[in-house]
Amino acid sequence: MSKVHVFDHPLIQHKLSYIRDARTGTKEFRELVDEVGMLMAYEVTRDLELQDVEIQTPVTKMTAKRLAGKKLAIVPILRAGLGMTDGVLSLVPAARVGHIGLYRDPETLEAVEYFAKMPQDIDERQIIVVDPMLATGASAIEAISSLKKRGAKSIRFMCLIAAPEGVEKMQEAHPDVDIYIAALDEKLNDKAYITPGLGDAGDRLFGTK
């Protein structure tokens, strides 16, 4: 069964309070999501494999540590996932970036893929799928299934807030994928919105309705 990591770091919780606040404008909301994405990425990448390299400092030669082999790929779920991508990239600027777009079928309510563009060596990289919200879990489950079909073997999912219902469905569908969240909220309401939540992350990021 996948592990659920809930971050209680004071800086993350402080910034998340402003992200949730309905009075927070688009510019500040976007900046805060970016910042929290960076802070979360620090912990998500904590156990990346390192290798020894020989370097020359201004004083002497030494053995240092660098990331081993192929490194990271960040895959935002369009469009809200874009808001977290730059924050992760500020920490690991050499990471490759894929994109996956999904929409909800109005009849079946299932997530349907309409766009996907991935690095060619996706099977050799540690994948971090990013999306601000894990509500029903449908989009995240479909995105991860799509990545696995393309050969991805090592995947993690990172979001700002999640509902227990979405976490449960993710664990059932992908028990090998660890979930990293800034807050686990109470529930989904009758419109499948996370409660208390933060509203529609995409609309708040891009100033749309």
UniProtKB/Swiss-Prot annotation:
UniProt keyword GTP-binding present: yes
Cofactor: Mg(2+)
Catalysis: reaction(s): UMP + diphosphate = 5-phospho-alpha-D-ribose 1-diphosphate + uracil
Pfam families given in the database record: UPRTase
Gene Ontology molecular function terms on file: GTP binding; magnesium ion binding; uracil phosphoribosyltransferase activity
Enzymatic class: transferase
GO biological process per UniProt: UMP salvage; uracil salvage
Listed EC numbers: 2.4.2.9
Keyword tags: Allosteric enzyme, Glycosyltransferase, GTP-binding, Magnesium, Nucleotide-binding, Transferase
Inhibition and activation profile: Allosterically activated by GTP.
Binding-site residues for 5-phospho-alpha-D-ribose 1-diphosphate, renumbered to this chain: 79, 104, 131-139, 200
Annotated uracil binding sites: 194, 199-201
InterPro entries from the UniProt entry: PRibTrfase_dom, PRTase-like, Upp_B, UPRTase/APRTase, Ura_phspho_trans
Pathway(s) where this gene product acts: Pyrimidine metabolism; UMP biosynthesis via salvage pathway; UMP from uracil: step 1/1
Record note on cofactor: Binds 1 Mg(2+) ion per subunit. The magnesium is bound as Mg-PRPP.
Function: Catalyzes the conversion of uracil and 5-phospho-alpha-D-ribose 1-diphosphate (PRPP) to UMP and diphosphate.
Family affiliation: Belongs to the UPRTase family.
Protein name: Uracil phosphoribosyltransferase
Native organism: Staphylococcus epidermidis (strain ATCC 35984 / DSM 28319 / BCRC 17069 / CCUG 31568 / BM 3577 / RP62A)
Lineage of the species this protein comes from: Bacteria, Bacillati, Bacillota, Bacilli, Bacillales
Gene expressing this chain: upp
